[in-house]
């Protein structure tokens, strides 16, 4: 049995092109995962990804996860709702292109359909522009 998988891409060249979410929920906070913790990325990737057929990292060893999130070009942000982890996004800065990729973004199943997705996406886009300004020139060029 084969399943058709579609990938969609969004390109935003300026924050003025962004239609922001209407509100940040009162009990929600998005913050950088610092220090980086591969277990958090692995948890979200597997938990959210099983619903969306994310498979490329399922074969990764802990060493591969650690190498990935240790790369200075990779930043992980966590959405917390009432202090519980609800979702995440990963940003990857591509120095040579002067652009930032939202590598993965998602909400845990129990937080879906609660008006959090637009808030998470808006934050990911805003932070992707910040990443362009603050990523170190000394960042390692390898990803994955």
Regions found by a protein language model. Name each.
Residues 60, 80-81, 86-97, 104:
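A conserved beta-strand-loop-helix scaffold within acyl/acetyltransferase catalytic domains
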């Amino acid at each position: 049995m084969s399943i058709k998988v579609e990938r969609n891409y969004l390109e935003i060249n300026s924050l003025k092109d962004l239609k922001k979410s209407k509100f940040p929920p009162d009990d929600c906070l998005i913050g950088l995962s610092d220090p980086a913790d591969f277990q958090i990325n692995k948890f979200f990737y597997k938990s959210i990804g099983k619903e969306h057929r994310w498979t490329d990292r399922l074969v990764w060893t802990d060493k591969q996860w650690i190498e990935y999130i240790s790369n200075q070009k990779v930043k992980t942000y966590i959405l917390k709702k009432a202090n519980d982890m609800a979702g995440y996004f990963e940003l990857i800065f591509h120095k040579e292109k002067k652009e930032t990729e939202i590598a993965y973004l998602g909400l845990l199943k129990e937080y879906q359909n609660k008006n959090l997705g637009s808030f998470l996406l808006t934050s990911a886009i805003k932070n992707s522009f910040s990443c362009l300004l603050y990523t170190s020139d000394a960042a390692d060029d390898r990803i994955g």
